[in-house]
Amino acid sequence: MPTPRMSMRKLKEVLRLKWACGLTHRQISRAIGISVGAVSKFAAQASQAGLDWAAAEAMSDDELDARLRPAATNAAATTTRRIEPDYTALHRELRRKGVTLQLLWEEYAEANPGQRTYRYTQFCQKYKDWAKSIKRSMRQQHRAGEKLFADFAGPTVPVLASDGGVEFEAHVFVAVLGASNYTFACATRTETMADWIGSLCDALEFIGGVPELLVPDNPKALIARPDRYEPGLGTTTQDFVNHYGTAMLPARPRKPQDKAKVEVGVQIVERWVLARLRHYRFYSLAELNKAIAELIADLNQRPFKRLEGNRREWFERLDQPVLRPLPVRRYEIATFQKCRVNIDYHVDVGGHYYSVPHSLARQEVWARITRHGVEILHGGKRVAAHARSRLKGKHTTIAEHMPAAHRAHMEWTPGRLLNWGASVGPGAEAVVRHLLTNKPHPEMGYRACLGLLSLARKYGKHRLEAACQRALKIGSPTRRSVLSILEAGLDLQPSLPTTPAEWRSPEHENVRGPDYYH
């Protein structure tokens, strides 16, 4: 059975995590849910196509697919012989501190893009056969600025109502940096997706930067497709990760080595913070979080028992210098909605209609909806952005999204129409003024005046002025009357023998007068 083709969205995420976040192929494999071989394959294709992350990010899905197709064809035509590693060099490099077979295999695969290389297990077995006695260690090592581990503590803290009864049990979120053990904690009402993402945002602001990886304890609130080996992030979770330019690697179930750091951190918070608060009464979440923040500050400045310094000093020395900068804006939780663009180049989001470029009419797009804004995405790229409106049945339209003819129509204001009428002649100006002030709705007057413009293009301004003068004299200054006069050629005949007094519209409640438009 053929391997299903990977989506362009997932391929872009591979390239972002590799080039923008600097993750290894195995870390990317776990984060996205594809094999390490597939990661290596697509990274090699992108390199052969001469791409970098800046170029790939700017491309639409179709452009990226077309760019990579030739590279994929060339890669498939390479020799089927596998590249043998240099076993002597492997044996020598393994003596260096921190170097593992995992790292050496990744370097071996990356050094031979587009070539057939050994999978990780084959690589290890062949080296073992050569060296006869090699043992691999699973010892956890955390580089500075690499990982922020996160989980919720087990015990909860009661928050009381004004009558002294328990209003709700607050849950305590804990985050720990891998290298320095610098710790953050805060309380939330629940453990929903909004609580998880909001607490992670608070943690990132607390440390003042962004690590390479976020490692939560595989929470259902963040994971759309639970899987022991290839968990899939939810759409909103992935959007949050993209906003901060990082990656998320949920800990595997029943794999304590994946989350040992945060489990120790949770235990310390329970003993150092929650145990000290057990006799206090809290009547709001803000009051509880203030008390937690004070104790966390003390915890981070508390000296280590077996090492020199404290968490704060280690953070300033190790993690802080290498953290990536925070984005300008804090992440705002977004929901996503698939939409089809209507024939009028607007999409329906919550009963309000937002414009997109008219070329996308009848196509499918995604709406990214936040509390304050609506973004429209097509082919992985943003094509429109609007302030969110709660007005049902109304339209929000950007002029640049409109066809040229529609845009020209919108640019004709009452003042501009009157100026145009005056440029034709006093008769045309009088007819335009009548049309603008005597139609039941302004839009009807605009359309009638635009009809006069089309008559000027067809018959010329001189004939239009003569027709307007005749329409005024017969007491019928309408577009239809002017058209009839022109079609019958009456404007070419001598003017009527008598000149009636200036025509005036009868007084009635629909008459606005020129001041209505100023």
UniProtKB/Swiss-Prot annotation:
SUPFAM superfamilies, sorted: Ribonuclease H-like
Any one biological process term the GO annotation gives: transposition
Region annotated Disordered, chain positions: 496-518
Keywords from the UniProt entry: DNA recombination, DNA-binding, Plasmid, Transposable element, Transposition
GO molecular function: DNA binding
Pfam families assigned to the protein according to its UniProt record, in alphabetical order: Mu-transpos_C_2 (PF22483)
DNA-binding region: 23-44
Basic and acidic residues compositional bias, start-end: 504-518
Domain Integrase catalytic: from-to ranges: 140-335
Highest taxon, organism lineage: Bacteria
NCBIfam families: transpos_IS21 (NF033546)
Family classification: Belongs to the transposase IS21/IS408/IS1162 family.
Record function comment: Required for the transposition of the insertion element.
Protein name: Putative transposase for insertion sequence IS408
